[in-house]
């Protein structure tokens, strides 16, 4: 890798990208909403949406999705293309409005909160998390603009794991500011919780994996002789990473760096075939989003099946 600095965040709609593409007054309004809360005006949202769409299309994107985290343990999404009805000359237009950026209306009946209700009764609404940057995901389906969102009901009840997190962060900030004021600081306006969510995982050769129904159906070993402690020779915590495992880690790092994930530390773990990836601490909701990206990218990586527990 010749230039990690240039690679890092290259698939993310960062503040630097917004500064380049948004009018100065719009950029300031967006940053204020990100740092201090509040809503964007419809006109501002339209400008941001157009800039985001233009950036995504220039990088090969054809669709966008509101990327959210329902009560299933993994992320969910629905893809919509940027195309609109052709004009009178039959020319296809690509558009993305502020309304489409800020809010979506997916069917929530298939999620745990849906119960036995019909699809038209179990509505769910996605709401843009402006503090978490949009990013581009590229795979066999193409290049998709992923917009991190919260997921709630018509009346505002949380239907996901992110909404309670955002509300908790706000509550912590409000109460922590009271303590900050006691120490004489009158300038601070916000206290931001941070998280460093390391991932420990097992790498199992595909041929061996397919022989174990417990791994296939449960994601863990349920039968067989207990493994020895190991670590007596060169397979310990600080042991040299095997070349095949190292190649996997290298590929993961490159993908994560493109998406702005600060993958920092990698090493063997205590159990046989166990390894770890740890990012740098980040703002709590960003760390949670990045953790989902880590799991998605890791599980999709080349001929190895990874189990995270």
Residue ranges and their predicted role:
Residues 123-309:
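Glycine-rich, acidic/polar active-site loops that bind/position phosphate-bearing ligands
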Residues 3-97, 102-121:
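Histidine/acidic residue-rich metal-binding segments in metalloenzymes
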Residues 1-15, 41, 246-262:
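N-terminal-biased segments
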């Amino acid at each position: 890798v010749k230039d990690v600095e240039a690679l890092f965040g290259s698939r993310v709609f960062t503040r630097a990208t917004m500064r380049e593409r948004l009018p100065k007054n719009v950029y300031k309004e967006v940053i204020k909403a990100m740092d201090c809360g509040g809503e964007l005006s419809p006109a501002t949202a339209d400008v941001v949406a157009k800039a985001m769409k233009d950036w995504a299309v220039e990088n090969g994107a054809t669709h966008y999705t509101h990327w959210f985290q329902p009560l299933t343990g993994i992320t969910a999404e629905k893809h919509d293309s940027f195309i609109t009805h052709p004009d009178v000359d039959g020319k296809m237009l690509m558009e993305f409005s502020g309304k489409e950026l800020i809010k979506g209306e997916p069917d929530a009946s298939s999620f745990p909160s849906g119960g036995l209700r019909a699809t038209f009764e179990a509505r769910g609404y996605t709401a843009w998390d402006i503090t978490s940057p949009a990013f581009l995901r590229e795979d066999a389906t193409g290049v998709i603009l992923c917009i991190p969102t919260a997921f709630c009901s018509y009346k505002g009840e949380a239907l996901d794991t992110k909404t309670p997190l955002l509300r908790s962060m706000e509550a912590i900030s409000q109460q922590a500011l009271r303590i900050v004021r006691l120490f004489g600081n009158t300038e601070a306006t916000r206290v931001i919780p941070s998280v460093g969510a390391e991932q420990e995982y097992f790498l199992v050769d595909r041929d061996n994996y397919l022989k174990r129904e417990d791994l296939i159906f449960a994601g863990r070993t349920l039968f067989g002789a207990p493994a020895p402690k190991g670590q007596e020779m060169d397979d310990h915590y600080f042991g040299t990473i095997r070349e095949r495992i190292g190649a996997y880690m290298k590929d993961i790092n490159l993908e994560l760096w493109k998406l702005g994930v600060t993958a920092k530390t990698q090493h063997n773990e205590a159990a046989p075939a166990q390894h770890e990836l740890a990012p740098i601490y980040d703002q709590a909701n960003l760390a949670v989003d990045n953790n989902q990206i880590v799991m998605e990218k890791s599980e999709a990586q080349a001929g190895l099946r990874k189990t995270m527990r």
